[in-house]
Amino acid sequence: LGDVYKRQIQDVFFGTDYHSHLGTRRGGMTSFSPELGFQRNIHSIENSPFRTKFEKDVDKMRGNICIGCISDTDPQPIMVRSKLGLYAVCSIGVIQNAAKLADELLEKGCANFETMSSGAINSAGLIGALIAQKDSFVDGIRYAQDKIEGTMSLAIMTDKSMIVARDKDGRLPIIIGQRSDGYCFSFESFAYQKLGYSTCHELKAGEITEITKDGYNILSEGTDKKKICTFLWTYYGYPTACYEGVNVELMRTRNGEIMAENDMKNGRLPDVDFVCGIPDSGVPHAIGYANKSGIPFARPFIKYTPTWPRSFMPTSQSMRNRVAKMKLIPVHELIEGKKLLFVDDSIVRGTQMRETVEFLYENGAKEVHMRSACPPIMYGCKYLNFSRSTSELEPVSYTHLTLPT
């Protein structure tokens, strides 16, 4: 999230914190003031929330322009110095050919890259180096978009303005907010609405736009091409968010209604006592199913929200498995001897589904039925890191589930 106006530091602090559901590894803020120049702070947020790590930094930061981000991979923002000047870069997406692009730049002797503890190249730094190959930000961004295999949305902060670019296929959103004394941009619209802004523009696929304290100017027109990630509505997006004008919570509820309609039409409506949803994103799907089917909705398990994050966020598979099991606390009175249908938002690795079925039977459920709000994820996504497949992180197509009898 970025901002240009007189109270921007605190607004970016709170607005970036509203993106905490999108990442749990690194947070960063960069501001600029004529007196102090660029000021940057980056912290690990794996064991502490964004607000806790940055509240002292905010008191010290000064400037008339500021940008912040939360990342599940790279430390960001990255500072880049080139013929285009000194600027900060944030990015989101997956660069499949990062190593190849880095080698090409190094062979030209035109770049040094910041590496992460894993040894991988920081994607924001790579993008900044690609942009620096051209004589303007627009040409540089277009060049980077053409060279990158995968998905790249980015934000650049100079000492005068911010430039934002949505990926060519429009897989991820970038939204601009307006208030009487300034403008901002964000991934999530609700992040700035709580700060008094209202949405004034949503970037099209491939669009490049400059934002100043006086307004925004489209530097390069986008297209109506839409390949936005459906997982934003299914799972990843926050319930209050809207993408392409469609609210996440309403979509999930309607999806549950459609599942119930299909079951009723095909004679598959189960004889159960309750419909329940896997917290958090499975709950509205379950509410929609219950409303349409007439089966009562109940919460036989409660997510312990103070400490347990979403189960796909931890970096190791063993920790994901443990989180999936530990975060749900049973309400025995709503489980023992009951026939239950639970609704989950998706089946990616099968970990949570298996744990939930075992959890319900272990706590005395008589029958357990389940519905998934979207088809099983059969392959890892090469464009975004929502459901990527690695050697220890395999989609459900390769997983055999043994359920209790």
Model-found features: residue ranges?
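Flexible loop/turn segments at secondary-structure boundaries
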Residues: N97, R171-L172, Y192-Q193, N217-I218, ...
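Secondary-structure transition/capping motifs at alpha-helix termini
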Residues: K265-D271, N291-A298, H332-E336, E358-E367
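Short, glycine/charge-rich flexible loops or terminal/linker lids adjacent to PRPP-binding catalytic cores
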Residues: G294-L340, M378-T390
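Conserved short alpha-helical segments that host acidic/polar catalytic motifs at enzyme active sites
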Residues: D3-K204, E210-D273, I278, E367
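Extended, hydrophobic alpha-helical segments in both membrane/secreted and soluble proteins
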Residues: V275, G282-Y289, F297, K339-L360
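PRPP-dependent phosphoribosyltransferase catalytic core
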Residues: K160-S161, G196-E202, V357-L401
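A conserved beta-strand->alpha-helix junction
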Residues: S117-G125, F297-P309, L401
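Conserved small/polar residues in nucleotide/adenosyl-binding loops
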Residues: G2-Q8, T399-T405
